[in-house]
Amino acid sequence: LIDALMPIERIKNIFTTLRPVAVIVDEKCQKQAAKLGMGQDVYDYEQIVQTSPDADKLQAVREKMIDADPVYALFTSGSTGVPKGTVLTHLSVMKYTQWYAETFHIDENTVFGSQTPFYFSMSVSTMFSTIYTGAKLVVIPKQLFSFPVKLIEFMNEARINTIYWVPSAMNMIANFKALDEHRLPFLKTVLFAGEAMPTKQLNYWRRHLSADTLYANLFGPTETTDIAAYYIIDRDFRDDEPIPIGHACRNCDVFVLKEDDTLAGADEEGELCVRGSFLASGYYDNPEKTGEVFVQNPLNTHYRDMIYKTGDMVKYNDRGELVYITRKDFQIKHQGYRIELGEIETAVSAVSRVYECACIYDLERKLIIIYCSGQNLTSKDILLGVRDRLPKYMLPNKMFFLENMPHNANGKIDKKMLQKIYENEMQK
């Protein structure tokens, strides 16, 4: 699936990589497909669904297919500006779907409330587990995520009992305190992934849903089908305490490597690495990029053993649970100290009246920048709120307050947009 709202040049880059022989479009996208002018056949979706399948041809395809064959490619942003197509196999999706359905008790009684678009890796979980178990999938209209009360009313009318959302979507309900007056009596499973879940907002949800509701923090990139590690919330957390990402999923092995490719010890930071049946085959028609992150396991010199280096910096806490720190490329050196921007975000998120926040770094001016939304906030509020949580060298140098934080198409806080907003601000 391709987002028709993407810039035409980005779509062309994807088509140049994939070189598809055919494209299926709905009526609204026919003109856009024609503009691509790349020679592929274009088929109308409405006509296809009314066409009887050719059973013999389908059977011939099934007989040739093996579980190592690709089932789809999901495109994510690339450092060169050209999207990378992550190739997943039938085996990866089947193993992952079985684990997901069994772990979170997905069955024919499950009613998913879908928040993420179908071209985002999180949709793999809900879409394929629905097919696998006979569950029901309800697509929540995007505009409702700007109106928390209407969103809750929609969820109750649809009797939604399971959600798997990005935290930004959950934050919106918590920040407006929508559950103070409106209940979600059917909701029994709350799963989240895609970005760090602010503990303050999670605690709000936990106070307002029934005591037997299951909450879980899921963690993993597109390159691991969707998830590689997870943590089912089983204890209370302070508002300024990060939620662990937990332990490896079944058929996954996760471990933490230091820069010298040795295992990180207790409380040592390192890069999260993944091996197992959830792994992607690599990036479509991009062997160079594939070879950079899908590599031989340095802990095993005896036979071929591929791992994926996620670029996520993590460590084990004193309970032996993995805790996410930041992206490898979000680490900075400031005043001689190595700093994780994610740690600053966690501290600011815990401040009273803060709804959402993001931290960026001005390398040229050596400044830590905070953007946040909230209720009647000032720079003094933020500094007073974090001074007992952060050392002086980690305190924000500049703070900007927005009515609403920008989000990308997947619902995450858009840090690239914040970087542009900041650069424009500095040019004034």
What are these regions (language model features)?
Residues A4, F75, T103, T116-P117, ...:
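Conserved donor-binding loops in enzymes that form glycosidic bonds
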Residues L1-N13, E27-Q30, A135-A158, Y164-M172, ...:
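ATP-dependent adenylate-forming carboxylate-activation enzymes
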Residues I8, V23-E63, V93, L214-N217, ...:
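AMP-dependent adenylate-forming
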Residues Y132-A135, I160-Y164, A174-P244, D253:
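Gly/Ser/Thr-rich phosphate-binding loop
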Residues K57-F75, V82, I106-F112, F118, ...:
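Conserved pre-ATP/AMP-binding loop-to-beta segment of ANL
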Residues R19-P20, I160:
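Proline-aspartate-enriched helix->loop->beta-strand connector
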Residues I14, P70, H90, Y100, ...:
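Generic structural signal for small/hydrophobic residues in well-ordered secondary structure
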Residues K84-G113, S121-N161:
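Conserved AMP-binding/adenylation subdomain of ANL enzymes
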